[in-house]
């Protein structure tokens, strides 16, 4: 229970400035609700800005425009198959029905939110009932970060940046790995060289995938004049005498600010990627940080939610991805590298333990399961 004295009032308070938080804010604004986003770090974008920027939405408008519309019942069958009973039919149906509407809403909310679909990036299990070799991953086009103006410096960027002018769309990356095999791979190489030339001649600062997605979402927020407070961590959720959440305490400019949220607080502050004590509690097999996620992700929102009675699930899960760690500590995704011919992956006993081209979640699950047997699988070795 808290005393009802507030320094600031809004209808909806969104905690976190990644893709989920910004989407929630745009929707609240569309419902004529006074909305505020608060972000713990000095930069916006969260883990979404560091990601591949793909959104799996069968039946999205960009798919329909290309003349391909997966059948909702097939999509439901596929999701039910791959989730193995962990998700209710009601929730699966909601995703199948509402995700395309979400994409349609975003496209209509701002001209910056442009989405494209390219066939051929297959579902992870296209052989299963309802799976598709065409795929349903939706992306955004590249964008010149100069469009952000002064906000460009506030976009969270990856630790390992490509040389100036080098950026990959998802399809570019797949073809680039064929550079020694066919003309399509060589064409991508020529394209990359031309991008470097343009960057140096004209000052372009092009960005793709997650960087482009979050730049576009930030521009959409600006279109709607939705305020975003940076360097403003949420430290506590406030409740009334009945235990209902009525707002939050946010640290701003060195002092606590009590914010009333008349219609609710949206927690979109990410996971606990870099809280090693908490991670070891759920997955002791992982001894080091090794996370690509937002450096500010320490589980603050989850803890605050638990304190007011929120339930949690799947805290032992993550978006797993095998990676290589350079001597200086930088991490590099291992996506196409695992699928190249004439190479294989072995554990500490020198034995293969999985199909190298398996989906990255399956690959990492196999590493964790193998580590529990007492044979080293973390790390494993690419031969």
Protein language model regions, located:
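Short, acidic, Ser/Thr-enriched surface-loop or helix-capping motifs
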Residues: 240, 251, 347
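N-terminal Rossmann-like FAD-binding beta1-loop-alpha1 element of flavoenzymes
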Residues: 12-37
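Conserved N-terminal/central alpha/beta ligand/cofactor-binding core
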Residues: 40-227, 343-346, 352, 358
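Short loop/turn motifs at secondary-structure junctions and domain boundaries
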Residues: 39, 240, 334-338
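Glycine-rich loop(s) and the adjacent beta-strand/alpha-helix scaffold that form part
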Residues: 202-211, 223, 252-328, 332
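Extreme N-terminal leader/targeting segments of oxidoreductases
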Residues: 1-12, 30, 215
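A conserved short coil-to-beta-strand element within the FAD-binding core of flavoproteins
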Residues: 230-244
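FAD cofactor-binding and catalytic pocket of flavoenzymes
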Residues: 166-175, 322-383
């Amino acid at each position: 229970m808290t005393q009802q004295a507030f320094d600031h009032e809004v209808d909806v308070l969104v905690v976190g400035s990644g893709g989920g938080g910004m989407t929630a804010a745009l929707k609240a604004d569309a419902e004529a609700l006074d909305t505020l986003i608060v972000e713990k770090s000095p930069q916006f974008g969260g883990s979404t800005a560091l990601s591949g920027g793909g959104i799996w939405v069968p039946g999205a408008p960009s798919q329909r425009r290309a003349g391909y519309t997966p059948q909702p019942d097939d999509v439901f069958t596929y999701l039910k198959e791959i989730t193995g009973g962990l998700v209710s039919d009601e929730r699966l149906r909601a995703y199948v029905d509402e995700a395309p509407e979400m994409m349609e809403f975003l496209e209509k909310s701002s001209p910056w939110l442009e989405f494209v679909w390219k066939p051929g990036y297959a579902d992870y299990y296209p052989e299963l009932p309802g799976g598709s070799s065409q795929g349903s991953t939706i992306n955004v086009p590249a964008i010149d970060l100069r469009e952000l103006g002064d906000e460009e410096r506030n976009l969270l960027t990856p630790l390992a940046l490509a040389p100036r002018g080098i950026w990959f769309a998802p399809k570019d990356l797949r073809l680039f790995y064929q550079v020694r095999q066919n003309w399509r791979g060589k064409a991508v190489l020529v394209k990359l060289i031309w991008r470097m030339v343009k960057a140096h001649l004209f000052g372009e600062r092009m960005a793709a995938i997650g960087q482009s997605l979050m730049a576009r979402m930030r521009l959409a927020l600006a279109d709607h004049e939705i305020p975003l407070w940076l360097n403003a961590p949420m430290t506590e959720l406030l409740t009334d005498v009945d235990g209902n959440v009525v707002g939050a305490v946010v640290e701003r400019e060195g002092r606590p600010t009590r914010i009333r949220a008349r219609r609710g607080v949206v927690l979109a502050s990410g996971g606990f990627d870099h809280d090693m004590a908490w991670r070891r509690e759920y997955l002791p097999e992982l001894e080091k940080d090794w996370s690509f996620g937002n450096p500010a992700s320490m589980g603050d929102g989850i803890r605050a939610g638990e304190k007011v009675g929120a339930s949690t699930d799947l805290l032992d899960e993550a978006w797993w991805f095998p990676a290589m760690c350079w001597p200086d500590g930088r991490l590099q995704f291992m996506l196409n590298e695992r699928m190249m011919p004439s190479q294989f992956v072995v554990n500490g006993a020198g034995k293969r333990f999985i199909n190298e081209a398996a989906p990255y979640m399956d690959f990492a699950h196999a590493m964790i399961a193998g580590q529990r047997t007492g044979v080293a699988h973390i790390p494993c070795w690419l031969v």
